[in-house]
Amino acid sequence: MGVFTFEDEINSPVAPATLYKALVTDADNVIPKALDSFKSVENVEGNGGPGTIKKITFLEDGETKFVLHKIESIDEANLGYSYSVVGGAALPDTAEKITFDSKLVAGPNGGSAGKLTVKYETKGDAEPNQDELKTGKAKADALFKAIEAYLLAHPDYN
């Protein structure tokens, strides 16, 4: 098994606590509202805390797909969150799991700065496919921007 690590940063005009709530604690409600392609988020194992596995169902290219998302840790006090993709359409055949560790901090003008570390664990000696990585990043960025747009369009959310 190989482990490949990538880091990314993103800025948002939305305050850290509001963004964290939408991305983590209220994500099951916000994501389907922010993106029509997301149909449902359901717990298939656990109570919402670490160890919980969620099934996220969405439409892509006219097809219903899902992803299994395992919560690794939640650090509300420090606006940190870690989860792994452990199955479904977002997990390439070459990957054992893909873990996302994120943390939000105060950014410029009352907004947020997000720091993300991605750990891509491959099966055997496989290496991540660069095209799949680019596609995955583009989808993650689009999800983030859709949630950000939802929050900006709903200033009373909190």
Swiss-Prot record:
Gene Ontology MF, one: abscisic acid binding
GO cellular component terms, semicolon-separated: cytoplasm; nucleus
InterPro entries: Bet_v_I/MLP, Bet_v_I_allergen, Plant_def-hormone_signal, START-like_dom_sf
Keyword Signal: no
Gene3D superfamilies cross-referenced by the UniProt entry: 3.30.530.20
Annotated SUPFAM superfamilies: Bet v1-like
The keyword Cell cycle is assigned to this record: no
CDD domains: Bet_v1-like
Domain of life according to the entry: Eukaryota
Transmembrane stretches, start-end: none
Gene Ontology annotations of biological process type: abscisic acid-activated signaling pathway; defense response
Induction: Induced by salicylate, methyl viologen, chitosan, hydrogen peroxide and sodium phosphate.
Pfam families: Bet_v_1 (PF00407)
Record keywords: Allergen, Pathogenesis-related protein, Plant defense
Similarity section: Belongs to the BetVI family.
UniProt function note: Involved in disease resistance.
Protein name, per record: Stress-induced protein SAM22
Species the sequence originates in: Glycine max (Soybean)
